[in-house]
Amino acid sequence: MKDRLPELKQRTKETELSKDKDVPTTEAEEQGVFLQQAVIYEREPVAERHLHEIQKLQESINNLTDNVQKFGQQQKSLVASMRRFSLLKKESSIAKEIKIQAEHINRGLDDLVKEVKKSEDESGPSSVVTRILKFQHAAMFRHFQQTMFTYNDTIAAKQEKCRTFIFRQLEVAGKELPEEEVNDMLHQGKWEVFNESLLTEISITKAQLSEIEQRHKELVNLENQIKDLRDLFIQISLLVEEQGESVNSIEMIVNGTKEYVNTTKEKFGLAVKYKKRNPCKILCCWCCPCCG
């Protein structure tokens, strides 16, 4: 059998020489990769700053959600008592706090959108920082949107309860008024229908009248709250339309990542097969005495 060990040594030397010749190119390529990684590491403080702001914004949304839940718990039952001034005052303070928090969160989400666009211009839409900001904005905006919808439903339910209470009081007093007429009084505040002549005409007491007027004040207060939040809901609806494209983009990126991972697995499998078929290993086998 022919001894091919000298041939193996010769090929090994040629391989080493070819590696020495390719060193500048390889180092340049590696330097390019390391430079890119270095840029990411240098930008880590920027990412941490964004994450710190995101955490503060998320805490604000959680506090808003808690206040909305407290407001909703208070509206589950209407207290048919004349001593409701303190309760109304407390509800009004919570509503004002919710409004301030919602406006603050809305400004924070707007600033985050600006940061996303800035990151896209500087690093591209597929950079790590950009994708993190997009995902965090989408998640927090969805949470904020659900909270505000819950608050709106709570206010609408309370309006309906107050309206039902007023109709019931009028029925008990024996005064039947058309629903449209009562609604006009509620919207316009024309309570001259409940004057002294009405008190003498029907058997309604001043206590009942005061309770009805109290409910009317609640309705007026609720309508003012809805008017204050109208602009905010319009901005939310516009952001929903913008978020649709962002969510679709994120979904496409995730699907692309899955395809890339599958392709990488296939390439690793081929690499294992090519490694098993390495010609150097075949030459080594021919040199072994056991194969003689």
UniProtKB/Swiss-Prot annotation:
Region (Disordered): 1-28
GO cellular component: endomembrane system; plasma membrane; presynaptic active zone membrane; SNARE complex
SMART domains with a match to the protein in the record: t_SNARE
Pfam family, one: Syntaxin
Record's compositionally biased regions (Basic and acidic residues): 1-24
Swiss-Prot/TrEMBL keywords: Cell membrane, Coiled coil, Cytoplasm, Membrane, Transport
InterPro entries in UniProt: SNARE, Syntaxin, Syntaxin/epimorphin_CS, Syntaxin_N, T_SNARE_dom
UniProt feature coiled coil, ranges: 46-122
GO biological process: exocytosis; intracellular protein transport; synaptic vesicle fusion to presynaptic active zone membrane; vesicle docking
Topology versus the membrane: Peripheral membrane protein
Molecular functions (GO terms): SNAP receptor activity; SNARE binding
Xref: Gene3D superfamilies: 1.20.5.110, 1.20.58.70
t-SNARE coiled-coil homology domain boundaries: 209-271
UniProt family annotation: Belongs to the syntaxin family.
Function recorded in the entry: Plays a role in endosomal trafficking of the epidermal growth factor receptor (EGFR).
Record note on quaternary structure: Interacts with EGFR.
Protein name: Syntaxin-19
Organism: Bos taurus
Source species taxonomy: Eukaryota, Metazoa, Chordata, Craniata, Vertebrata
